[in-house]
Amino acid sequence: EICIESNKRLIHFSTDCIFNGEKGNYDDGSLSNVIDMYGKSKYLGEVYGDKTLTLRTSLIGHELKSSYSLIDWFLNSNSTVNGYTKAIFSGLPTIEIAHFLYEHVLQSQLHGIYNLSAAPISKFDLLTLVNEVYKLNKTIVPKSDFVIDRSLDSHRLRSLTKYTPPDWNTLVVKMYLDYLSLGALLNER
């Protein structure tokens, strides 16, 4: 109501964590089946209306002052880490999400709840790519004992916006270049 009355639009980010990860390839109509508080709270926070857009996704990238993200954790980890071959996700780097918003959302009337995703990838394969692109020379030990698939199917959003996410190699290269430019910017301060 507030958005309609003020002629503003709300863009809200939800998460793939609203799903328990037992089956993967969740589409826009899949019902949340998670039992933890984080996932439940994100699901309850999803908004739907004429002036609202909720994007379900998973973000990867760099943080400014901490190392809690998967990528920053990996950069700061020991020379040998575990990489889970059966932990599947389909999120996007923050730089690609910013590009998507700028190119496909801000000037559109898009509203509703949609999944925003890349091709599914395992945490092992993702860390392997980051290791190569960032030239880290770390050893990633494949582990298959942790199984979860929170991949999202975003075909409906792709069809509406004509957006095709880049392949994972391109996404990681974009993330790395953004990381380098952010480092240069922070060093100027």
Q: Can you annotate each of these PLM segments?
A:
Residues E1-I11:
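NAD(P)-cofactor binding segment of oxidoreductase domains
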Residues I35, V47-G91, I95-E96:
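NAD(P)-dependent short-chain dehydrogenase/reductase
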Residues F89-L92, I121, L152, Y163-P166:
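Residue-level signal for the nucleotide or nucleotide-sugar donor/cofactor binding architecture
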Residues D167-R189:
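Amphipathic terminal alpha-helices
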Residues R9, C17-L55, L59-L64:
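Catalytic helix-loop patch of NAD(P)-dependent Rossmann-fold dehydrogenases
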